[in-house]
Each structure stands twice: as C-alpha cells, then as structure tokens.
Amino acid sequence: ERVRKEISEERVNVVRLDLTDLTSVRSAARTIEEDIDVLILNAGIMAIPFTTTLDGFEAQMGTNHLGHFAFAGLLKDRVKSRIVTVSSQAHLMGNFGDGSIETLREFCLGKRPYKPWGAYGNSKLANLLFTFELERKAKANSWPFHAYAVHPGYSNTNLQLVAPQAKGKLVEERMSALANSLIAQPAWKGALPTLCASTFPDLYGGSYLGPDGLFEMRGYPKAVRARSIAYDQTLASNLWSVSEELSGVSWR
C-alpha cells in the first residue's frame, strides 16, 4: 500500500504469490503477461521450527529455493535482462552432505535431521548454486538475461524476529530487536546490493554482491566471493535436477 501511494496505482501491479504453494506460484506466473526487465527473487523465511509446505517440502528449502526456482522458471521466457536472487552470509552454514541427487532430495523433503539455522543456511547456499548454474545455462542456451546473487549483510528488518516469534520465545525476540537497533545497518542500505545488481550497467553475469564493510555485515555494495562449495558445478547440476523434479518446472 505504501508503494502504491508513493508511486501511483497506475504504475504498481500487485500479484498474489505464496511461495509455499506451487499452485499459487503457477497462478501468479500466469497472471504476469508483460515482459520483465528485472526479476528479483527476494522473499524468504528464516530459522523457523520444522514444518513443511503444502507440497511437502521442508519449509525453508521450499520457500527460499524451490518456490523461487519454480516461479523464475515459469517466467523465464518473459525475462529480458536480469534475474537477481537474494542470498545471505548464512550460506556459510549450508551443508548438503555428499551432494548426491538422493541426498539433496532428502534435504528438500525434510528427511534429514533438522536444525533451523542449518536449514536456513542450506536454502541460502541453494540460492547461490541456483544463480551460478542459471548463469551457465543462460550463456549455453543464449537466453537474453544474466543471473546475479546478492546478500544484504546484517540489516534491520523484521526477518530476524520471525523465528523467536514462531517459537514463542519473548526474550530471544527482544534480544534480536536489540541487536537490530545496535548492530544492524538500516534496511535501505541492506537493499543496495540488490539495487546495484538490478541496475548497474555492464555488471558481469554471475556476479555476487554484498556490503564492503567488516565481515560483509555493513556498508556499500561490492563484488564479494561466496564459499567455494557454492561454485561446485556438480552439486549445482544435481540441485537443479532435483529442483526440476520436485517443482515440476522444467527450464528447457
């Protein structure tokens, strides 16, 4: 509503999208008929107690990765310039075991021992594996867009409060709110890597952007390096195969 008021009703088109429900994802994609200059895959959940999506996926992988994978795949032919995926420094906690197709399928379906932060890290590692594999496929197939990944550092948003609220832990919620106010950078600054990846001219495809400050927690956008496993092409290819299988969306 705020965006509508500031920009005008005529320039804002709101589409209902629930990333935990592939039926909703498909419906939203069908609703969008215009060409898309920049598709930003930003929505997510963080470190919540174990639950599954309507399609039976572990909720964080289902929402943060599979929902976006399906939505972007359904819109692929309408994207003309860039696909930007928002990851996180939490990808450093990601661990997909031996990285086989069967193991990745088990992680996506919640068949592995669950730790809220570990699952969040996996979903954010999946964002990076997806981005770098998408850029390789875009080049190989002469698709008209590039893929980019970004992370916001430690930014003051409501995301940090969701997990303690879901667990009913008031003290943890208040500590998160205090850390947000004392340590985190403003939300607008955390959005700058996304804006840069969406608009900066001549940005090399497959770039990963984040804050330039200490430990990439705060600052202005710069090109950053993900952990080495995020560039593993075999792992990325396996995740892509599992993602197509589970989502029912083929990028071919």
Named regions from a protein language model:
Residues E1-G168, L246-W251:
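Rossmann-fold NAD(P)H-dependent dehydrogenase/reductase core
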Residues Q165-A177:
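Flexible internal linker/loop segments at domain or repeat junctions
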Residues S123, R174-A223, Q233-S237:
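C-terminal helical subdomain
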Residues L109-Y120, M175-A184, S228-I229:
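A short acidic, glycine-rich active-site loop
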Residues F57, V224-I229:
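Short glycine-enriched, charge-decorated loop/helix-capping segments at active-site entrances
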Residues N127-F130, G190-P193, L239, S243:
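Alpha-helical packing segments of well-folded alpha/beta enzyme cores
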Residues G99-T103, R227-R252:
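Non-catalytic terminal and boundary segments that flank Rossmann-like NAD(P)-dependent oxidoreductase
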